[in-house]
Curated annotation (Swiss-Prot):
Name of the protein described by the UniProt record: Phenylalanine--tRNA ligase alpha subunit
Molecular function terms from GO: ATP binding; magnesium ion binding; phenylalanine-tRNA ligase activity; tRNA binding
Subcellular location: Cytoplasm
Cofactor: Mg(2+)
EC numbers, comma separated: 6.1.1.20
Main localization of the protein described in the UniProt heading: cytoplasm
Record lineage: Bacteria, Pseudomonadati, Pseudomonadota, Alphaproteobacteria, Hyphomicrobiales
Amino acid sequence: MADLEDLKTALLSDIAAAADESALEAVRVASLGKKGSISALLSGLGKMSPDERKTEGAAINALKDAVNTALSARRGVLKDAALEARLANETLDVTLPVRPQGAAAGRIHPISQVMDELAEIFADMGFSIAEGPDIETDDYNFTKLNFPPDHPARDMHDTFFFHPDKHGRRKVLRTHTSPVQVRTMLAQKPPIRVICPGRTYRCDSDQTHTPMFHQVEGLVIDRSSNLGHLKWILEEFLKAFFETSTVNLRFRPSYFPFTEPSMEVDVQCSRKDGEIRFGEGSDWLEILGCGMVHPNVLRNCGLDPEIFQGFAWGIGIDRLAMLKYGMPDLRAFFEADVRWLKHYGFRPLDFPSLASGLSP
């Protein structure tokens, strides 16, 4: 028992001395991990007699509970301290007087800038902008786009669903801007040539994914558009956006419910010293998905696939910004850090065009 008391004193002392969450995690692993000191004691219970096991087991479990309680309490203290330090570091006094003339001007967020670039480039190719609501019906987000009832995208782990209404119908936060294409085809007759930029939502969060992100999709519907036209549009867009005289694209067969055939598009690039350059090199980078609009989607939108055809594509706006302007972590886009915006933001009077994109 004396050994357990000594171990308890040592562990509680280490927990109290942990200066940050990584140090605290090291103490937890050293005590409660698979090879930790308390875990070793618990594994040795099987070698004891029933009476010893009863006495020692109760004491070891009490030690384990005490350590878990101390870990939880210390973790809360460290999280509070980290939050206070961050708030103190980012505090802005909004009561300060207006900055004098000549002070640094505000900057345009990279997402806003890239959306402006997309609008300008595609406008030069005759596209208009179509928009729709962020909260969509299941019908527009899935059914009219030819998603089968058992498609994984309809699961809770991938889509944000609202509670059902009194009729049992559930609305969703749109998972793509494709519902805008549906609304466009229902509202107007071909020829159609639109891009659909906007916010989209999925249950995902890591260095390259966030629960809310931005996407732009394009749609062309008429009587004769084909994959050759799609290839030309994508090449011209990527050349203008990445400001290169040439791009080489690789089309790979893929599957999307709303297009047939469906393709993933890779762009040729080189990677050197952390920099990606397009139009050269031996590497390939996946950049977007596309395909010919599925006949079922046309029928669902009141268009005869025997008369009309067309193509569509989709690409992540946040990903475009990261690739063009060298931003490593998508999560920083939405942390409202003025210092980050000052570094990556843009001046208000810069304008892109089809002939030239816009680099800082």
